[in-house]
Amino acid sequence: MTRQWETLREYDEIKYEFYEGIAKVTINRPEVRNAFTPKTVAEMIDAFSRARDDQNISVIILTGEGDKAFCSGGDQKKRGHGGYVGEDQIPRLNVLDLQRLIRVIPKPVIAMVRGYAIGGGNVLNVVCDLTIAADNAIFGQTGPKVGSFDAGYGSGYLARIVGHKKAREIWYLCRQYNAQEALDMGLVNTVVPLDQIEDETVQWCKEIMKHSPTALRFLKAAMNADTDGLAGLQQMAGDATLLYYTTDEAKEGRDAFKEKRDPDFDQFPKFP
């Protein structure tokens, strides 16, 4: 099925599009297998932030342009002393900010993977809530081969997903794994033919959109809290506070303060 994705904002190195409640963020550097630069990451952070705040968006897809690569990680040509060097000549690892944003954004994020998801590209796959893989997808880590590593989500959370032994194999040997192998180890949710991947991904989005956004928000926060320590608990606590603010009980406390009177909390139930 051909879809008319609406461009929400123009960027240089990514695409940010919308279709029937779904946002799609596409890394648009196919000439380098969608390797990211500091600018690519900054643009993705901006797009994801906009998707978070847009009440017309319920689910977000992350993908790469073309059929050959989802993302091959950081562009090694931009790697300098102390990080990846952007136009401002400051070395950065701002992809860590992007990883965290994908984790805390209160909407499901689905990785739609075609071709290579290697290095930092595989880590982006790992931090997404769900992964739909095409049958030509290839996954793996290359850090130790190129003098790099991800000691955060790319290793610790990966080990939660595939198991510690398998995660060590992935990092220590730097092998590549096909889509079926990724499915077998729990790295992806399903594998579909390449020409059907967008149809399948949109179908998953549509199913998700039928469900309670508040329930999904808390489920995501709860699952992340298990691995994100106090930062994860802070996110879940913040979500709980936002939900509480919508109740009559919270409004009574606010209104009493504004009206300079004592609040009447006795009117609210004390559930066991």
UniProtKB/Swiss-Prot annotation:
Sites where the protein binds substrate: 33, 72-76, 84, 116-120, 142, 148, 245, 260
Record keywords, A-Z: Lyase, Menaquinone biosynthesis
Cofactor requirements of the protein: hydrogencarbonate
Binding site for hydrogencarbonate: Q141, T142, G143
Keyword Lyase: yes
Site feature: Important for catalysis: Y84, Y245
Catalytic EC class: lyase
One Pfam family, short name: ECH_1
Listed EC numbers: 4.1.3.36
Domain of life: Bacteria
GO molecular function, one term: 1,4-dihydroxy-2-naphthoyl-CoA synthase activity
NCBIfam families named in the record: menB, PRK07396.1
Function text: Converts o-succinylbenzoyl-CoA (OSB-CoA) to 1,4-dihydroxy-2-naphthoyl-CoA (DHNA-CoA).
Similarity field: Belongs to the enoyl-CoA hydratase/isomerase family. MenB subfamily.
The protein, known as: 1,4-dihydroxy-2-naphthoyl-CoA synthase
Origin species: Staphylococcus haemolyticus (strain JCSC1435)
Name of the encoding gene: menB
